[in-house]
Amino acid sequence: MMQIPKPKDSIWTDDQWSAIVSSGRDILVAAAAGSGKTAVLVERMIRKITAEEDPVDVDRLLVVTFTNASAAEMKHRIAEALEKELAKNPGSLHIRRQLSLLNRASISTLHSFCLQVLKKYYYMIDLDPGFRMADQTEGELLGDEVLDELFEDEYAKGNQAFFELADRYTTDRHDLDLQDLVKRVYEYSRSHPDPEVWLQSFVRLYDVTEESKMEELPFYQYVKEDAEMALFGAKQKLEKALELTKAPGGPAPRADNFLDDLQQIEELISCRHDFDALYERVPAVSFKRAKAVKGDEFDKALLDEATDLRNGAKKLIEKVKTDYFTRSPQDHLKSLADMKPVIETLVQLVISYGKRFEAAKQEKSIIDFSDLEHYCLAILTAVDEEGRRVPSEAAVYYQDQFHEVLVDEYQDTNLVQESILQLVKSGNEEAGNLFMVGDVKQSIYRFRLAEPLLFLGKYKRFTESGAGAGQKIDLNQNFRSRSDILDSTNFLFKQLMGGKIGEVDYDEQAALKLGASYPPNDAAKTELLLIDSADGADSSEDAEDFETVHWEAKAIAGEIRKLVSSPFKVYDGKTKTHRNIQYRDIVILLRSMPWAPQLMEELKNQGIPVYANLTSGYFEAVEVAAALSVLKVIDNPYQDIPLASVLRSPIVGCDENELALIRLEKKKAPFYEALKAYLANADRHDELYQKLRTFYDSLQKWRSFSTNHSVSELIWEVYRDTGYFDYAGGMPGGKQRQANLRVLYDRARSYEATAFRGLFRFLRFIERMQERGDDLGTARALSEQEDVVRLMTIHSSKGLEFPVVFTAGLGRSFNMMDLNKSYLLDKELGFGTKYIHPELRISYPTLPLVAMKKKMRRELLSEELRVLYVALTRAKEKLFLVGSCKNREKQLAKWQAQADRADWLLSEFDRYQASSYLDFIGPALIRHRDMEAHRTPGLSSSEDIARDPSRFHIRMLQQSELLEENPKERAEEKSKRLKAIQQGEPIPDSFSFDDQARRLLEWEYPYRELTAIRTKQSVSELKRKQEYEDEYSGRSLIKPSGDTLLYRRPGFMMKKGLTAAEKGTAMHTVMQHIPLTHVPTAEEAERTVRMLYEKELLTEEQQEAIDIEEIVQFFGTEIGKDLLRALRIDREVPFSMALPAGEVYKDAETAGEPLLVQGIIDCLYETADGLYLLDYKTDRIEGKFRNGFEGAAPILQKRYETQIELYTKAVEQITKTKVKGRALYFFDGGHVLTL
């Protein structure tokens, strides 16, 4: 069909005009952020409705939107456009008819359309016409009941196949894990148009024999891709290390090592297509001991960098070996074959559950959202004589009814929805009537099982002319944002989005083009605020999210204050003028909301009004928790925690001492029995007895009341009898608290409208809501319409726009927890699980599970890139990127290493390693000319990158900078105060202090120093205190940070990098376990380290940190030889010893108070001469102290003398034996310090 020419005075761009008027085939419009897609969609509909020739009635258009709000907005825009047309032509009956038809037009979400289909054609699938939509929690509870009955039946049948499945997926205590697995698989299968067919496809992954070829199995493609990426990544690192040997001062002696390593890696790459060959070669790879590099002519920084690169390559090869080649191909295949009958049983169990669940819902005449789609699909589908699926009569009706099917946000469609759309549209792609609008770069609903590959497949298949397939139209002109926003977004995503990471190539067609007109503003540059959370302190490496959000909130608050007090102008779309920025022009975007309360608190503390739609906190409210505890006790009084909670609450009013008195009645029995025993003593008539008697009598009354009344009536009876509703009203925030209690009552009433009844089920209903995180939320004091800073998730911001955007929390790690499960589900591959031996109870990942993990990691990273794209494209006039890192210099060096390439697109390997948004942004941004001051010379980059028009303002912030008071604000406050005094006016409140209040607030506890002394101290803590003591007073001049860790970090946190203390712990662990029968060789030491890792006494990071040379070197020293000759050796000797406080704290106010000192002595050994004490140290010596160890010795002696004195005192006190000698051994340099 010929395209209608665009009028000369048209406001539309050529591409927009093409999207408005093109027809005659399926059309896919790839509409970038801010490109006006909604306006184009509405205009297309209006032109069809008001066409002079062959106009289309509005009810002959099916318009599918993603949300109900979008549908309402679409109808509103169409109504406005029709009203304008009617004003031009008041006599038009056709336009008046369209306005009357608009309310019944099919402009809705797909779920709403499915509901229409079901109401019209319910009889085709034997559906009760009186069906209703089930509450989500109601559906889950019904599903639980069905599943319980199914499992009971399976157990009763004595089905051996079921027992084998249960043996593998249950514990010896319950079968909840297997129930969760069945529900999860069932729910996931519902995203497929034919769930049973998809479930049956599981088995093909496990349908193998020992003769099967690994390369022919469905999952092997992802195994091969991952292994290839790791091998090429290792090669890349070693090539870089080899380059460093050629640099001035580089570690030239290690060139041979790197060449040998490279040769081995290249041999692996040459046979990467052959799994059997890789199995033979990967385990045989051996990285020889690195040659020593000594002398002043070598640059230590280059040596360290080369060492890190080689270690990185070693870790990659070790990971490939661990993932794929610790077992032979035949063993892998046998594991899959062994799991086949188990998987078949699981599939049948899930299918049975699905059928029973559907029958249970039909019995109650309820359906859920998943049923809406599947029942609609069933109505629209028929089977012909040859067994093929074809459109049913109902589908043909809709094909005739709808002139065109228009789909908004097509990138978020799933497979079931696509099947429905294909059945209601007419014609094939080349002559169809399906009009799809979306942006695959904004597909961010993977958790709802959206399928962006549907969009990508059509985008690759369709052509611009529409010849041979559908037509694709690109709308890439952005009418929302300044050029600064677009240029910076393009600069980042050209480097980040492409290939398998991103799933779409960010090429010239995808890049954003300027469409809006703004006056020049140098302050509109995109800003990066990078906060160094370490701030030079080692202990801050383990800073929790709480600290990170605190510093980011301070930085953001400072920028907001500067913005609102500056002449920064924003364009107001309502007044069509530029005006000063207001709080409501600013939004803070977060990936998720856990940070929101702390951010809000900090902003409020700084006087910045802020609003967030928080949907949590309801169940944690004290009044709601108390009311729920009462209900739990009414249901079952033998629940200790709810009962104690009620007794402690204002409802009964017991204090801790009274609770203890009750418990003393029956120490081992349930608390309810203790309470009854207390009441059984008729001689008691004290206040506690009266309180308990009143409560007990009320409880019996409520329990009786609950048997013949509804839950809502019971709740109101409790409120009335206890007066708790009125009491809550008198508490701070009383109106809110009463509202919360009313919500609980209302929730009980709505629960009773479901198919369930009874108090027990209501409590399970509430527990289910809490487990799912479906919090009812609490009301907020500020509304969204007020002049406040908005705080929301990136997902919530989709489709919105704001003059100023802060994208915060960029350093937070991505949530990859799903990848650590014992099983994974994938739409393409099916079900991947661990191999589980039913008798030995051992398990390990099967290759399908590993393959799915690698595939899903790519998909998750692609999704995160799209989420970041959405965040950046919300900004109209100013964009801030805010993130924190733990060691800025190290982070910058890492980014530079990743960015050292000429291509625009960063390597897939480096992007695959990303664990946060900063890991994406940093390597891309460090190539920018505005980052030149923060990188070292010599970065490879193209001229295009250097000439890119984007502008950034890079700011590296220390925590100390954020603590400093603003001098300008301080001067303003001083000026206000002086002015008030001069004019005889009251001094502003911030300077007014009441004397009595001042005395109260400034009073200090006279024995405060004693509160800082714990009755139990470790030697390490005392040693740290000693380091800070002033030699004259003994008091601490520089106190250790409150962030200092008192406990060892768990292993999973060590993956983020080891502290010096953790490296020291690793060395001590090796010295504790290494055999002392003879001088160990390097190979024997390595075997010891490997053994400790396999026994999980060392983490992988600690294993890598061990310096074998330093351990071997120790046994070559005189003290090492003495140790091997010893008559008796005790390692890691724990002790506890009581000392007067005065011996530890010089000026403690109660010097005679006993203090328990604990410690662990590294090594005690006895020779013919006597008892010797040896302590190992991993302090860095070389290059840190002037004059080497000679200059370090006095400092180290003073540092450790307290520790060794306490060790000596403990040994002599406990063994009654004099210590003959004491020595410290320093691994760095092999130095011995005798004390």
UniProtKB/Swiss-Prot annotation:
Catalytic activity line of the entry: Couples ATP hydrolysis with the unwinding of duplex DNA by translocating in the 3'-5' direction; ATP + H2O = ADP + phosphate + H(+)
UniProt xrefs under Pfam families: PDDEXK_1, UvrD-helicase, UvrD_C
A cellular-component GO term for this protein: DNA helicase complex
The protein's name: ATP-dependent helicase/nuclease subunit A
Cofactor(s) for this UniProt protein: Mg(2+)
EC number: 3.1.-.-, 5.6.2.4
Naturally occurring in which organism (per UniProt): Bacillus velezensis (strain DSM 23117 / BGSC 10A6 / LMG 26770 / FZB42)
Protein family: Belongs to the helicase family. AddA subfamily.
Gene3D superfamilies: 3.90.320.10, 6.10.250.2380, P-loop containing nucleotide triphosphate hydrolases
The protein's role, per its UniProt record: The heterodimer acts as both an ATP-dependent DNA helicase and an ATP-dependent, dual-direction single-stranded exonuclease. Recognizes the chi site generating a DNA molecule suitable for the initiation of homologous recombination. The AddA nuclease domain is required for chi fragment generation; this subunit has the helicase and 3' -> 5' nuclease activities.
UniProt-listed SUPFAM superfamilies: P-loop containing nucleoside triphosphate hydrolases, Restriction endonuclease-like
Keywords attached to this entry: ATP-binding, DNA damage, DNA repair, DNA-binding, Exonuclease, Helicase, Hydrolase, Isomerase, Nuclease, Nucleotide-binding
Residues binding ATP, per UniProt: 31-38
UvrD-like helicase C-terminal domain residues: 509-799
